[in-house]
């Protein structure tokens, strides 16, 4: 996650360059948004300002316009980022080769990673002090991807794969060439019997009938509406309305969030077939994708998208943004599950961790801190009765090769863009 190396004498800056835009710095280090807001850039609280001004103004330009000394500000920001990095070190993150009798690996949602890790570290230390076997963990930030886990899975050797795996999205766990081989042989088996009421209201049963996968929480995606760019068009209230010709070249898709994009693509395919994928390509705002900019038929290449599909978590940042508001689709927010898998043969040794990670305490961190609704029945997710979900369901998952389907849908999506 480190960028350019700049030596200004006092401190080595391996985090950012003064020539980086404010937006690129915040995107790389989300924790810096609060730092900027409290250090002279209050307007960045407004997400629209961050999206527009933040993408065009470099840190150096911004500091000069505020008559702030760039060297002093840079040093202050480096110190802030190094402190955050020290939290990572103290929580035993990025430790290289981790070993234990029980190994827990995977990724955690970025916004709640630190509070989750604090809880996990404390729990693991307590458990290791009283058990005759050791528990170890390596849980990275979701935006770093899963390549390091995938490499072990590709070996086909269950001994090389962690005893507990955590990840959002469908790509890793449902690719027949990856986790599929282990699932068919019954290596992993995890089940949750009781489920939060929020997922039953609309007859959504997140319990796997094959008892192989467990869902600990979900990432819900909703519509973010930009009033100015939307103009006199009526905002879409359902996924079907979003896919209509009226919103051609108007919708920002979560292209930089692979798990969410995969969930979107597979859900649209399940509901509307390949025709739905073609419609998705048509409404996708091409101007956000440099390679397609030339072909884009946008009203204005530089204008913000009228609609963005974003995680529900980000809607809590909308306070004060008069031009932006969110819509929870009437036919349900897109649901991207956060899965947990555990090895059957290690059932006795992994059960304490599963009990802990599926507990009300951890569920509350998912729900309250990150607006990632928890499946724990005791957690109050704070959702209204009409805030339902759209998800593909277990029948569809178990009756399709999801890995191949994702590849086909993605290819169809890109081909459809090329033909526009």
Kindly give the residue locations of the regions a language model identified.
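Extracellular/periplasmic juxtamembrane helices and adjacent flexible linkers that interface
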Residues: 98, 348, 356-420
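Short beta-strand->loop
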Residues: 185-195, 320-334, 344
């Amino acid at each position: 996650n480190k960028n350019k190396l700049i030596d200004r004498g006092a401190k080595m800056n391996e985090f950012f360059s003064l020539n980086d835009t404010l937006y690129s710095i915040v995107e790389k280090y989300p924790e810096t948004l609060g730092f900027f807001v409290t250090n002279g850039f209050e307007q960045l609280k407004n997400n629209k300002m961050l999206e527009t001004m933040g993408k065009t103004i470099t840190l150096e330009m911004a500091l000069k316009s505020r008559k702030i000394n760039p060297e002093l500000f840079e040093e202050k920001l480096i110190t802030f980022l190094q402190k955050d990095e020290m939290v990572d070190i103290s929580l035993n993150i990025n430790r290289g080769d981790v070993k234990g009798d029980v190994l827990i690996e995977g990724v955690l949602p970025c916004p709640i990673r630190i509070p989750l890790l604090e809880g996990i570290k404390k729990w693991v230390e307590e458990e290791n002090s009283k058990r005759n076997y050791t528990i170890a963990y390596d849980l990275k930030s979701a935006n770093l991807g899963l390549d390091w886990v995938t490499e072990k899975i590709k070996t086909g050797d269950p001994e090389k794969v962690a005893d507990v795996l955590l990840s959002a999205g469908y790509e890793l766990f449902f690719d027949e060439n990856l986790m599929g081989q282990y699932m068919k042989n019954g290596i992993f088996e995890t089940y949750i019997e009781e489920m939060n009421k929020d997922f039953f209201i609309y007859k959504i049963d997140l319990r796997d009938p094959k008892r192989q996968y467990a869902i600990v929480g979900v990432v819900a995606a909703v519509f973010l509406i930009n009033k100015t760019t939307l103009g006199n068009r009526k905002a879409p209230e359902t996924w079907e309305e979003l896919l209509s010709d009226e919103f051609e070249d108007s919708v920002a898709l979560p292209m930089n969030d692979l798990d969410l994009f995969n969930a979107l693509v597979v859900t649209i395919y399940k509901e509307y077939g390949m025709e739905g994928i073609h419609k998705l390509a048509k409404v996708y705002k091409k101007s956000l994708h440099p390679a397609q900019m030339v072909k884009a038929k946008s009203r204005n290449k530089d204008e913000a998208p009228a609609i963005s599909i974003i995680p529900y978590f980000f809607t809590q940042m909308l306070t004060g943004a008069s031009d932006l508001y969110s819509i929870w689709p009437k036919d349900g927010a897109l649901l991207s599950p956060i899965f947990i898998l555990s090895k059957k043969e290690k059932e006795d040794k992994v059960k304490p961790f599963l009990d802990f990670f599926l507990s009300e305490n951890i569920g509350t961190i998912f729900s309250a801190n990150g607006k990632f609704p928890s499946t724990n029945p005791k957690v109050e997710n704070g959702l209204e009765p009409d805030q339902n979900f759209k998800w593909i369901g277990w029948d569809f998952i178990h009756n399709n090769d999801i890995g191949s389907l994702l590849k086909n849908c993605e290819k169809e999506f890109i081909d459809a863009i090329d033909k526009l």
